[in-house]
């Protein structure tokens, strides 16, 4: 969805702000790590009747496919409540998106070193940040042995702290950085990737020029 946000005047990242705030600290960390981060006004959710589940509905005010390392800070508004990184080569990361906490626990049990990885807690699961791997495709339901696990690489986004939004039941969701380092994509999980071609995730709209 493409909407223009006019509720508040833009407050850009390089303007005078409270540098002690958690919002500033997390954004500064993402920028220092070279992530191609940007913001958009807010995120809603809606109930998908066909899939029988609640889904995110990001209200973009930027055609994010046009965001680059050179211009992404121009699209970082501190008045916004929704934030994302362009994954893949632009940010130097390939993200494992586990949308089920039980599956994440099982994955950690089978791959204990994952506890050392840069990890973000989401509403239903976790994002595990790995060093960019050009041989891995963006895909949904990506692993053979783990359910509800997607790969966010080139031509994809990963919502990130300090992103927050409200569910239909009124619960407030806040993305939280848990710590860790950005390490090489685990070989055990790379070997577990499904090899057949799958369509890209339809969770995000990719705008054409």
Question: Where in this protein do the model-derived segments appear?
Answer:
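Conserved phosphate/metal-binding and DNA-contacting active-site motifs used
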Residues: 1-209
């Amino acid at each position: 969805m493409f909407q223009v946000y006019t509720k508040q005047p833009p407050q850009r990242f390089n303007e005078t702000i409270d540098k002690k705030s958690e919002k500033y600290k997390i954004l500064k960390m993402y920028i220092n790590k070279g992530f191609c981060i940007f913001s958009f006004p807010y995120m809603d959710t809606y109930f998908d009747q066909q899939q029988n589940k609640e889904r995110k509905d990001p209200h973009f005010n930027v055609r994010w496919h046009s965001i680059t390392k050179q211009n992404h800070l121009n699209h970082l508004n501190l008045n916004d409540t929704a934030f994302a990184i362009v994954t893949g080569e632009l940010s130097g990361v390939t993200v494992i998106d586990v949308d089920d906490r039980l599956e994440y626990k099982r994955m950690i049990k089978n791959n204990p070193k994952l506890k050392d990885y840069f990890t973000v807690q989401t509403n239903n699961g976790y994002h595990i940040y790995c060093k960019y791997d050009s041989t891995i495709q963006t895909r949904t339901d990506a692993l053979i042995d783990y359910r509800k696990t997607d790969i966010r690489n080139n031509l994809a986004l990963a919502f990130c702290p300090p992103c927050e939004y409200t569910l239909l039941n009124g619960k407030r969701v806040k993305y939280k950085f848990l710590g860790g380092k950005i390490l090489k994509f685990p070989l055990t999980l790379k070997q577990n990737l499904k090899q057949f071609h799958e369509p890209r995730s339809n969770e995000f709209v990719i705008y054409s020029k």
